[in-house]
Amino acid sequence: MSCPVPNPGILDIAPYTPGKSPVPEPGRKVFKLSANETPFGPSPKAIEAFKKVADHLEDYPEGTSRVLREAIGRTFGLDPNRIICGAGSDEILNLLAHTYLGQGDEAISTTHGFLVYPIATMAVGARNVIAQEKNLTCDVDAILKAVTPKTKLVWLANPNNPTGTYIPFDEVKRLRAGLPSHVLLVLDAAYCDYVSRNDYEMGIELVATTENTVVTHTFSKIHGLAALRIGWMFGPEHIIDAVNRIRGPFNVSTPAMYAAVAAIEDTAHQAMSKQFTETWRNWLTEEIGKLGLKVTPSVANFVLIHFPTDRGRTSDDADAFLTKRGLVLRALKNYGLPHSLRMTIGTEEANRLVVDGLRDFMAGK
């Protein structure tokens, strides 16, 4: 008996594996530090806005996310007509792949880039090409060397997940200048709100002055709206027009839309979250380093911790040890980092418990 057969390449895709979401045992407090979620939750104003429209769930949302695009435009000084919103930036990444990639094409991502990139690329029959990183950081020269006549798109997370590293804006501009004009450069700025470096830009200036670059962003991180699935993209009008032609007509719900408007306007909530993250990121990097473990310098809301390969001291051993204490971090074998764990910067209590736990783990307790 025959059955439907997936398109070529679909079954070659490794399914995305999210961070663990454990079910707490009775009487045990669990800290989920595996998905880069904010410990503060959404702005109270976003929750209030969500509730205000919750009595009208029978109505379809406004199909173009106009009120949200206008709020984003006001915040960043952008033309709302050059903005598109989606059910998380993941949806937008997939829409870009469907719009600009096909059988026989190639897209480039870096060694430890976000796993959605190869999934989106391979789902449309294109080939994902890996450009090697240097010190867990994007190497512009390696990307440029990977370009072939088949290259149609480059994915660049800046800052990168799961490494937490970034490249300066001058390097991003050098990358754009070195790419053929027909190659679309996608700048994924999901974690840009946490960066305080003077040489960093999320990429809006580059998008505004070119016809072949877009920048995507999300409300899942500093805004704390991951459950609502909201993202957006700023790009040239011709790219926005093309992507809109295949975008679902009601892809952002009304409650999500209004919660996002309130969230982006609550700058005090964002500033508080950014300052807390920076303080505890520095503290965690220093304290974990004192234990003899290497931490990759991060500009995001997480840190990447590297473990020895000695029996009893591995990342798997540490993961099991911490999980027993209700501390859930992210194992990274599927990112090609089998000896590392990624830790979301959590509450003060969670952060201190992780350091205490790692101290006991390294001491063999």
Curated annotation (Swiss-Prot):
Enzyme class: transferase
Any GO BP: L-histidine biosynthetic process
Gene3D superfamilies (alphabetical): Aspartate Aminotransferase, domain 1, Type I PLP-dependent aspartate aminotransferase-like (Major domain)
EC number: 2.6.1.9
Keywords assigned by UniProt, alphabetized: Amino-acid biosynthesis, Aminotransferase, Histidine biosynthesis, Pyridoxal phosphate, Transferase
Reactions this protein catalyses: L-histidinol phosphate + 2-oxoglutarate = 3-(imidazol-4-yl)-2-oxopropyl phosphate + L-glutamate
GO molecular function: histidinol-phosphate transaminase activity; pyridoxal phosphate binding
Description of how the protein assembles with itself and partners: Homodimer.
Organism of this sequence: Bradyrhizobium diazoefficiens (strain JCM 10833 / BCRC 13528 / IAM 13628 / NBRC 14792 / USDA 110)
Stated name of the protein: Histidinol-phosphate aminotransferase 2
NCBIfam families: hisC
Pathway: Amino-acid biosynthesis; L-histidine biosynthesis; L-histidine from 5-phospho-alpha-D-ribose 1-diphosphate: step 7/9
Cofactor(s) essential for the protein: pyridoxal 5'-phosphate
PTM sites of type N6-(pyridoxal phosphate)lysine: 221
One Pfam family from the record: Aminotran_1_2
Family, similarity comment: Belongs to the class-II pyridoxal-phosphate-dependent aminotransferase family. Histidinol-phosphate aminotransferase subfamily.
